[in-house]
């Protein structure tokens, strides 16, 4: 799956062209998430009609597809709801029929866009096919709009006219798996519902006048009386979706809608809605409003400054300029409101500026982002680290008998990089776990464990699943994320925000170095009461303060790296990266970047495992990149590099400035050196990884690869 975007205007006139442009711009803001098709749904020319436009390829192909219909783009809509989606093929291959949005039938009575995975879709599909529904795609999503239609038709046959959010709740009760979805319907004109379970959704709110509102009340659904009960046993063969009548209740539509007085397309359907806490009427009249819905808050930055993050099991219902949030799951830990938060994103930070692409911009931003993660937290005068987000849990954290860091992808590598300093400073066992494997193994977790969850987006599905597992085991949880309103930031007990800003490139660059520093700061803060570590802590804190300026020095290597890629590297499709100690994590991260961005096979190897098999490969002269900066392992790394040179390999050595050991080999042309500033051993990996980021970037550029949208990459792991 990939990106969701929606736009609703109420009593604010917009032309069809403006609505289409808004939806397209919203999708373009989500382009940094890898996708292979896109689509939108908007209101048609006829009363209570919806049109769908979708196409494979880039969003530009979708725009061309829309233009083929010669739509009247000047047609005004005083109120309207449109939805859009970019898709990365998961269930079903890349063909137009599999693109979102998906419909319930040829007349588009219900239209859905969806992120996530419906795990019981095969059973639902079989049941719906038995009912006469025809499926045109191979996706799991298509069962959702058809289920909407089936339940809606069944309720009408029984004499019940359900409200949209009640109907949605009935549909969601039949779904297993994860979802973030938007649904519009010709039966509910100018309305949209949004539902979340395991896949993020955020709603931006904008009025013509300022609103002094800080929360939206949650309206809990009465599961016994407030909707029809559907008895669906999808795990048994031969069963069908059936409805049992229930008594008349207040969720059934009864009174004429407000829209008949104000909107261009009035309707004779009847319903009854409660009042909205978020968008109260102004002087007794409805307030002109705009709502923007997305799976990523970064896409909302240009439109709104106030957002509401949906929680799992939430159903948001937007109609008549009002936002209602319903929840079907009542628990002791559930809040009765959703906070309206200020969106702390600057528009300039989500634009390329003078750079050719986002990856290049984000590599160069590391001078600033490493400052940002330390700002107000690292005090070089007192040699202290202050982490306000952890203070309330100080006692529990310092009492930890074990620390477990859990992450995926590059975040996992940052955890590996920080593990040795945690072990050294804290003197407790430290485990680093891949989130998916951690959950699969049902690891033993105890109440005196501290579990640290690291994620760039804060929405990585595997990491969230691991977090939920640890919460059930009553461990103390820390979140290290870049997005303050993300699931991980909200569900953990405490946390550290990396303040990295939006990272729109697929490749993790600035987030990796910021996570690395954040984890080191946590280790420093948690070990503050250990007297034996005072001098070591001072050394690290002083080194942290000059890291941003040292990164600037490393970036000056770019001309040399461009020449190296052009003359020696671009013709190769296999690379070996050698590292040991702190630098093995750098080798892992560098190899990952080269695979992801440059489309080359790259392998990270512990230097002392440079046995006969690896040396046999080295004799074929693939480029070998070795991390040989000064630390406790330098002599052994030098010995391994000598073996490579003896076998006529020509390694590229990342070493410290002024390190004379390689001068003779360099003069003979046996090696190429990339010299970086020296820092304390536990921070050297921050500087060492940047040349690999630049090599990956320039190899891709030399091969005409789109670095911001590499193939077969995704920002967050799907729920599979």
UniProtKB/Swiss-Prot annotation:
One of its GO terms (molecular function) is glutamine-fructose-6-phosphate transaminase (isomerizing) activity. CDD domains: GFAT (cd00714), SIS_GlmS_GlmD_1 (cd05008), SIS_GlmS_GlmD_2 (cd05009). It comes from Saccharomyces cerevisiae (strain RM11-1a) (Baker's yeast). Residues 266-285 are annotated as: Disordered. InterPro entries: GATase_2_dom, GFAT_N, GlmS/AgaS_SIS, GlmS/FrlB_SIS, Ntn_hydrolases_N, SIS_dom, SIS_dom_sf. GO terms for biological process: fructose 6-phosphate metabolic process; protein N-linked glycosylation; UDP-N-acetylglucosamine biosynthetic process. Its EC number is 2.6.1.16. Involved in amino sugar synthesis (formation of chitin, supplies the amino sugars of asparagine-linked oligosaccharides of glycoproteins). It is an enzyme of class 2 (transferase). The keyword Ion transport does not apply. Residues 266-280 have a biased composition (Polar residues). It catalyses: D-fructose 6-phosphate + L-glutamine = D-glucosamine 6-phosphate + L-glutamate. The active site is at residue 2. Pathway: Nucleotide-sugar biosynthesis; UDP-N-acetyl-alpha-D-glucosamine biosynthesis; alpha-D-glucosamine 6-phosphate from D-fructose 6-phosphate: step 1/1. Keywords: Aminotransferase, Glutamine amidotransferase, Repeat, Transferase. Residues 2-321 form the Glutamine amidotransferase type-2 domain. This is Putative glutamine--fructose-6-phosphate aminotransferase [isomerizing]. PROSITE patterns: GATASE_TYPE_2 (PS51278), SIS (PS51464). Residues 393-532, 565-710 form the SIS domain.
């Amino acid at each position: 799956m990939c990106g969701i975007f929606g736009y609703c205007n109420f009593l604010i006139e917009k032309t069809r062209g403006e609505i289409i442009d808004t939806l397209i711009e919203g999708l373009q803001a989500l382009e940094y998430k890898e996708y292979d098709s896109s689509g939108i749904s908007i209101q048609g020319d006829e009363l209570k009609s919806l049109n769908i436009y979708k196409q494979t390829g880039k969003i530009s192909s979708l725009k061309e597809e829309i233009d083929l219909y010669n739509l009247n783009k000047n047609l005004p809509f005083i109120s309207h709801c449109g939805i859009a989606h970019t898709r990365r093929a998961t269930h079903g291959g890349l063909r137009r029929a599999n693109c979102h949005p998906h419909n319930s039938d040829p007349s588009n009575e219900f239209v859905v866009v969806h992120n996530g995975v419906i795990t019981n879709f095969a059973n639902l599909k079989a049941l719906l096919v038995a009912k006469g529904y025809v499926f045109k795609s191979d996706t799991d999503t298509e069962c959702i709009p058809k289920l909407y239609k089936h339940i809606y038709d069944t309720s009408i046959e029984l004499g019940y006219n359900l409200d949209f959010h009640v109907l949605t709740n009935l549909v969601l009760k039949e779904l297993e798996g994860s979802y973030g979805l938007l649904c519009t319907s010709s039966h509910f004109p100018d309305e949209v519902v949004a539902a979340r379970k395991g896949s993020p959704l955020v709603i931006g709110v904008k009025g013509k006048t300022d609103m002094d509102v800080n929360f939206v009340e949650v309206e809990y659904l009465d599961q016994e009386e407030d909707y029809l009960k559907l008895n669906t046993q999808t795990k048994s063969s031969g069963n069908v979706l059936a409805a049992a009548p229930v008594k008349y209740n207040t969720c059934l539509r009864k009174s004429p809608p407000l829209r008949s007085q104000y909107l261009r397309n009035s309707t004779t359907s009847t319903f009854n809605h409660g009042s909205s806490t978020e968008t109260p009427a102004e002087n007794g009249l409805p307030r002109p409003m705009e709502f923007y819905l997305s799976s990523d808050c970064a896409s909302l930055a240009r439109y709104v400054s106030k957002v509401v993050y949906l929680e799992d099991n939430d159903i948001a219902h937007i109609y008549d300029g009002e936002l209602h949030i319903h929840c079907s799951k009542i628990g002791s830990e559930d809040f009765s409101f959703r906070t309206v938060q200020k969106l702390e994103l600057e528009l300039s930070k989500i634009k390329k500026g003078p750079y050719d692409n986002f990856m290049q911009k984000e590599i160069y931003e590391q001078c600033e982002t490493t400052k940002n993660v330390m700002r107000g937290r690292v005090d070089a005068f007192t040699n202290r680290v202050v982490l306000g987000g952890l203070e309330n849990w100080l006692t529990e954290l310092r009492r930890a008998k074990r620390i477990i860091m859990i992450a995926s992808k590059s975040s996992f590598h940052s955890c590996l990089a920080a593990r040795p300093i945690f072990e050294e400073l804290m003197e407790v066992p430290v485990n680093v776990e891949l989130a998916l494997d951690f959950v699969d193994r049902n690891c033993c977790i105890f109440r005196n464990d501290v579990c640290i969850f690291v994620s760039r987006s804060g929405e990585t599905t595997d990491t969230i699943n691991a977090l939920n597992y640890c919460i059930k085991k009553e461990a103390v949880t820390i979140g290290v994320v870049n997005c303050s309103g993300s699931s991980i930031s909200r569900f953990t007990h405490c946390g550290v925000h990396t303040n990295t800003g939006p990272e729109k490139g697929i490749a993790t660059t600035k987030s990796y170095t910021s996570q690395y520093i954040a984890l080191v700061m946590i280790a420093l803060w948690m070990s503050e009461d250990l007297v034996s570590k005072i001098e070591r802590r001072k050394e690290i804190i002083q080194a942290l303060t000059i890291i941003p300026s040292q990164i600037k020095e490393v970036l000056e290597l770019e001309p040399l790296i461009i020449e190296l890629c052009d003359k020696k590297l671009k013709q190769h499709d296999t690379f070996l990266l050698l590292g040991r100690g702190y630098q093995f994590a750098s080798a892992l991260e560098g190899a990952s970047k080269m695979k992801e961005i440059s489309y080359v096979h790259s392998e990270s190897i512990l230097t002392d495992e440079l046995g006969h098999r690896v040396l046999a490969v080295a004799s074929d002269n693939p480029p070998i990149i070795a991390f040989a900066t000064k630390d406790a392992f330098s002599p052994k790394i030098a010995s391994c590099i000598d073996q490579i040179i003896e076998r006529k390999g020509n390694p590229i050595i990342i070493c410290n400035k002024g390190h004379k050991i390689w001068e003779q080999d360099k003069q003979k042309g046996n090696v190429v050196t990339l010299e970086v500033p020296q820092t304390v051993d536990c921070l050297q990996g921050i500087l060492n990884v940047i040349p690999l980021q630049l090599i990956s970037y320039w190899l891709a550029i030399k091969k005409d690869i789109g670095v911001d949208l590499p193939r077969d990459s995704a920002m967050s792991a799907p729920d599979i």
